[in-house]
Amino acid sequence: MASIKSLAALVAAMGAALLPAVAAQCANLTPVSQPQLAPGYSAKLILNQLSDPRSLQFDSLGNLLIVEQGGTGIRYVKLTDKGGVNVCVASQKQLIPNGNLTHGIALSANGKTLYASTATDVLAYPYDAAAGTVGQARSIINGMAQTGYHQTRTLLIPKDKPNVLLVSRGSAPNLDLPTAEASSGRSQIRAFDLNKLAGGPVPYTSGEVFGWGLRNSVGVGENPKDGGIWSVENSLDDMERSGVDVHNENPGEELNYHGSYKGARNPLKGANYGYPNCFAVWETSTITGVPNVQVGSQVIQGSPSGNVTDQYCQTVPVAPRLTFTAHTAPLDIKFHPNGRSAYISFHGSWNRQPPDGYRLSKVQFGANGQPTAASTSKSAEIKVAWNSDNAVCPGSCFRPVGLAWDKKGRLFMVSDSTGELFVLTVPA
């Protein structure tokens, strides 16, 4: 009688045989919505029929790992490189069959431990890049269960500090008032020493507060040139001020700077960025009663309460480094390998008219590691790839989510609404 292991191997082999053939994946695929591209860019659809793809991670051998939020887990994709956008899927298989995985993924510096997140836990798996296999999962961080829509737990291991895992957790409801205290454990980024997570899981609230007052910072990235950590904020829905609805154009989405994790004298480590009390202005004309209000100024929503006033918002919390159009929903930020630009996926709106977002954009950075645009700018965002008609969104257009650079400087991007994976070449 065959052993359990041999039967398992047979089942795995049969499953692999059912995957699409190489030739089929190298065929010309037609996108649901052909991206419009800025001059100098090229793009190609290389994989479709993904199940709500979210985050991307290249392993040490150039294999691409895709988190699929649609109850699938993590997919392992081997690529054939023919230069430029001529990239084909050589093979693919299910790496982790865990339907509870929601978004986050990261690899240890040596490439041998894979981290992934559910809504409640961060899991660690022994990982073999060559074989495309994982070992038994173990929970290393727990205690993140909450109600509401914000169930992603973004993960980042800074290259400047490879023993640290940053975990971003959003609010529960739209306006989560208890997060006015960092001890709530929500609407913040916490840091964990991986060297101390070899035993049982630790609660999320035991991590070091790296930044708080961050409503739902799904995208967290590192500038490779100076180690600066940046996040992109999905801000408040249905904003009003003293009973007046201002939500269509306010508040703006945010690009926030957290400094470098390795910096012993980083003054931004543990800083408060304002939520749930303060929100960045995008359209100044609808914000009344605030002298000299500018794009990026932080103001209250609702009515003043105690010490929480517009003046408080403009003097106490850290203001965003840049502000973007309201409700465009930035979900990832990845820096070009030269550190001179950051690419941001804007998933797109549900809470404004006309619809906006649904695009990939970039922000230019200078040699000092900061955006070249002023914090009051409305033109810092440079569109890279977009839909030709946002009126058909969100139902019939691409909605970018996860981004990843390969070793040749190409940018890979997934669209969750259409289940697609694109590769882009960028200008020198």
Name each model-derived stretch.
Residues 49-61, 97-113, 117, 145-164, ...:
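Beta-rich, blade/repeat-based domains predominating
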Residues 251, 402-428:
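Blade-level signature of beta-propeller repeat domains, shared across WD40, Kelch, NHL, RCC1
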Residues 43-48, 90-97, 138-144, 205-210, ...:
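A short beta-strand motif characteristic of beta-propeller blades
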Residues 68-70, 117-121, 127, 170-172, ...:
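Short loop/turn segments immediately following the C-termini of beta-strands
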Residues 63-67, 113-116, 164-168, 228-232, ...:
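Conserved beta-propeller blade signature
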Residues 92, 101-102, 120-159, 171-173:
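Asp-box/WD-like beta-propeller blade repeats and closely related beta-sheet repeat scaffolds
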Residues 1-24:
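Fungal secretory targeting signals
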